[in-house]
């Protein structure tokens, strides 16, 4: 891979390197904690921004996510989920706590860009063809769970098994939510309300 300075840290880091960083962080290595923060910050912030709908809350929840990571990293175990799925699970839990305490969603009129934007994604092409505001309106018709699944799958490129762990659901439930969400979006695009 290139060492281009504009390349995102998460794209440069291998699973083996992240594993080494986690092991070092578990032994109290501050530099390893800082590097884990830098590698994952953009993706965690982007996920929370898309989840809670505004920058201020996303910033607060991102800070809380990394504080929880700092408090809990000693208990992290490499079982069936990668470190990033564990970290996203912390972010997801905090966002659910946020929704329970605020009981409302306050979206901004912007959609964050996908993170692997070397090639236009299906999401980007759809946004260009129907417009950002129209896409927001379409996505807003989906259930919160469907929105979460699509975000984790198509914006953050998690596998179904990892999405299931993050959202604490079965892999079958994730596939079903994804299928229903995509079918709903397809129906809405093909048959817009008159």
Segments the model singles out, each with a brief description of its role:
Residues 60-67, 81-93:
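Structural recognition of an alpha-helix C-terminal capping motif at a helix-to-coil junction
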Residues 26-27, 53, 64-81, 101-103:
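Sigma70-family region 2
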Residues 71-78, 89-109, 128:
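Arg/Lys-rich amphipathic alpha helix in sigma70-family domain 2
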Residues 1-43, 50, 132, 140:
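N-terminal module of bacterial RNA polymerase sigma factors
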Residues 4-5, 14-18, 97, 105-132:
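Internal acidic/polar
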Residues 96, 146, 155, 161, ...:
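DNA-recognition helix of helix-turn-helix
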Residues 3, 24-35, 45-64, 171, ...:
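Short, charged helix-capping/linker segments at alpha-helix termini
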Residues 1-12, 24, 128-129, 134-137, ...:
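C-terminal edge and immediately downstream basic/flexible tail or linker adjoining helix-turn-helix-like DNA-binding
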């Amino acid at each position: 891979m290139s060492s281009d300075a504009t390349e995102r840290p998460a794209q440069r880091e291998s699973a083996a390197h992240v594993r080494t960083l986690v092991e070092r962080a578990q032994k109290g290595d501050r530099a390893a904690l800082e590097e884990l923060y830098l590698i994952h910050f953009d993706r965690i912030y982007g996920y929370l921004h898309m989840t809670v709908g505004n920058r201020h809350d996303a910033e607060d929840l991102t800070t809380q996510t990394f504080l929880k990571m700092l408090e809990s990293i000693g208990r992290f175990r490499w079982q069936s989920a990668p470190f990033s799925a564990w970290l996203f699970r912390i972010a997801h839990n905090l966002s659910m706590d946020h929704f329970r305490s605020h009981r409302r969603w306050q979206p901004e009129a912007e959609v964050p860009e996908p993170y692997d934007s070397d090639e236009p994604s299906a999401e980007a092409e759809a946004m260009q063809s129907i417009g950002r505001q129209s896409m927001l309106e379409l996505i807003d018709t989906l259930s919160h769970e469907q929105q979460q699944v699509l975000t984790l799958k198509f914006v953050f490129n998690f596998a179904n098994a990892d999405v299931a762990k993050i959202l604490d659901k079965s892999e079958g439930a994730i596939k079903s939510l994804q299928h229903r969400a995509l079918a709903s979006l397809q129906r809405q695009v093909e048959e817009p309300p008159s």
